[in-house]
Amino acid sequence: MALLLLEPATPVEWPVSFMLIALPLVAAFAHGPAAVGGATVFAVVLEGVLAGTPCCAGREVGYLWDRHYVASYICTGLVGVLGMILAAHRVRRERTLADVRFVADIAQRVLLRPVPHQIGSLHLESLYRSAAAEARIGGDLYEAVPTRYGVRLLIGDVRGKGLLAVETAAALLGAFREAAHDEPALPALADRVETSMDRRAVLLGGSEVGERFVTAVFAEIPLGEPLVRVVNCGHPPPVRIRSGEVCELDRGRSAPPLNLGVLLGEPYHVDAYSFRPGDQLLLYTDGITETRDAAGSFYPLLQRLRSWSSLPPRELLERLHQDLLAYSGDRLQDDIAALAVRLPAGEPPLPAAPPPG
C-alpha cells in the first residue's frame, strides 16, 4: 500500500518499486527456497503492476517496458536466484545443526545420564551446562551409583576441550560404573579407575599420553554409617551444608589428578566426615568457582550456599545455575557440573547391607 501511494510522486528514473528488489533476500532469512521463489515472482509482478498501471505510475501504460523497469525486473530475478541459493544453504545448515544436536543429546544421555532423584533415603540432583552455546557435552562429568557398599559418587573435570575431553570422560565413567560395584574400599576404586585410564592412554599413544589427566573426587556414603568418605584427586573439595553452616571437606591430603598418580607415585588418601540427617553434600567442578563477573571477581560459592542452606537439591542447583548466569552476564567461561546429595532431617542413614548368605 505504501508503494502504491509513493510511486506517483517519484520520477521515472527512481521508481519506489525498486525497493521490491530486496524482497527475495528478506524472505531468504526466514523461509525456504520455494517461498523465496514465490516472493520473487510476487515482487516482479507487483513491479509490473506499478509500472504499467496509469493510476499507480502516473504515466502511460507503455512504461511497463521502460528500460528502468526492465532493469528492475532483471535485478529482482537475479536477487531472487541468489536468495533461493542462500535459503537452501541456510536450511541445510539448520538441518545439520538439528542432527548434531540430536546426536549430542543422545550422547549426553549415555555419558551424563541424570542421576536417580532418590536412592534409599538420599535425595540427589545433578547439574551440567556446557560453556559452548551449541554444545551438550564436554569434559565435566558426574555419576552416582548405588552399590552393596553404599552410594558412590564421582565428579570430575577432564583437562582440555573437544572430542579428546569427551572420549576421556566416557572412558572414566565406564570404568567407574563397573568398578564401583566390585571394589570394597574407596582408594582401591580410585586406583582401579586410574589403571583403566592409564591403559587407555597407552593404547592411544602419541603426545596425548601425559595430557589426558582428570581432576576428580570419589565419595561414598556407606550403608549403616552416618558419614561420607572422600578421596580427592586434585579437585575442588566437596562442600557440606549443615544447619546454615558451610564447610569444605578438605584436610589437605589431595592425591594427584588421575593419570598422573603413577608418574608421581603418591597414594590415595581417604578421609571420613560426619554426614547426619539434614546434611547436604555438594560436589562441583571448578567451572563454578572460576566464573567471573564484569569486574573479574571469582564467584563466591561458599557465601551463596550459606543463604541457600535450606533448599533441597533440585532447588539448590536451579538457584545456583541462575545465579551463575546472572553473575557472569549470561556468558559462562567454562563447563559447569554439580552433584547435590541430601539426607533429609528425620531420615536414618542408609540401612546396613544384609549379611551374606
Stretches with model-predicted labels:
Residues M1-L6, V12, A34, A43-V44, ...:
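Conserved subregion of the PPM/PP2C metallophosphatase catalytic domain
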Residues M1-P11, L23-W65:
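Hydrophobic transmembrane alpha-helices
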Residues P15-A22, G37-G38, V70-Y73:
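Hydrophobic alpha-helical transmembrane segments
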Residues I21-V26, T76-V79:
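Canonical hydrophobic alpha-helical transmembrane segment
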Residues G48, G52, A171, A175-A179, ...:
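Solvent-exposed, amphipathic alpha-helical segments
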Residues A51-P114:
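Cytosolic coiled-coil signaling helices that couple upstream sensory modules
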Residues R67-H68, K161, E290-A295:
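Regulatory loop-to-helix N-cap segments in sensory/regulatory domains
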Residues F102-D191, T195, V209:
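Membrane-proximal soluble helical/coiled-coil segments
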